[in-house]
């Protein structure tokens, strides 16, 4: 069967996978969206799943400073051995992830960390909007599912499109690094700092400053 560009784009939005991977997944599954999602998940996690159960207690705390010192990121990435922690490929991965966080501002590492009450509130908003369209309940639920996946893709680090290569997600980049290095790797936590965030900026009185400087 013929796979349309719309199908490919919808699958890409739902999974964050590359265009060619999405097209192949749809071709392999006869154009079935849900089966194609499962296909991509199995394919994307294949290399990582064999190592996912191994303890990753070594690693690095990486940092990235941007925009003249006004934005900073710390990220902890774990691996299995100190040897890999010193590996250039691993260190580059940590640096890339820190840079991505600075640019994309995720709120969580993975979807399991999202507060259920936050997710439920989003679903209610999506449901209310979808019902206004007058579509059947089964279609409404599919719309909600797609919007929830987009919501995760916006706020969860692993599901975001990787800033240096938007055709793949951070999860895909992580899986590729695991496959290359041969050890389990896990992004544990991160913090992003914006200079002055949360502080009330004092509005200066320019005329008063000039008068004071002139000794008035």
UniProtKB/Swiss-Prot annotation:
The keyword Transmembrane does not apply. GO terms for cellular component: cytoplasm. SUPFAM superfamilies: Elongation factor Ts (EF-Ts), dimerisation domain (SSF54713), UBA-like (SSF46934). InterPro entries: EF-Ts_dimer_sf, Transl_elong_EFTs/EF1B, Transl_elong_EFTs/EF1B_dimer, Transl_elong_Ts_CS, UBA-like_sf. GO terms for molecular function: translation elongation factor activity. The keyword Protein biosynthesis applies. Keywords: Cytoplasm, Elongation factor, Protein biosynthesis. This is Elongation factor Ts.
């Amino acid at each position: 069967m013929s796979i349309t560009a719309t199908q490919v784009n919808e699958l890409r939005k739902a999974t964050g996978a590359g265009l060619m991977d999405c097209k192949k997944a749809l071709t392999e599954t006869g154009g079935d969206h849900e089966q194609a999602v499962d296909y991509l998940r199995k394919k994307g996690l294949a290399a990582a799943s064999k190592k996912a159960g191994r303890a990753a207690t070594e690693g690095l705390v990486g940092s990235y400073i941007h925009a003249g010192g006004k934005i900073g990121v710390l990220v902890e990435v774990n691996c299995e051995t100190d040897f890999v922690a010193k590996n250039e490929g691993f260190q580059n991965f940590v640096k890339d992830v820190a840079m991505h966080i600075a640019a994309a501002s995720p709120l969580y590492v993975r979807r399991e960390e999202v507060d259920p009450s936050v997710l439920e509130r989003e679903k209610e908003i999506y449901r209310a909007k979808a019902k206004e369209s007058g579509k059947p309940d089964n279609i409404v639920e599919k719309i909600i599912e797609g919007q929830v996946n987009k919501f995760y893709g916006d706020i969860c680090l692993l599901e975001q499109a990787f800033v240096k290569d938007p055709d793949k997600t951070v999860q895909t980049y992580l899986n590729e690094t695991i496959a290359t290095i041969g050890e389990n790797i896990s992004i544990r936590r991160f913090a992003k700092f914006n200079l002055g965030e949360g502080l009330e900026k004092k509005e200066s009185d320019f005329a008063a400053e000039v008068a004071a400087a002139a000794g008035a």
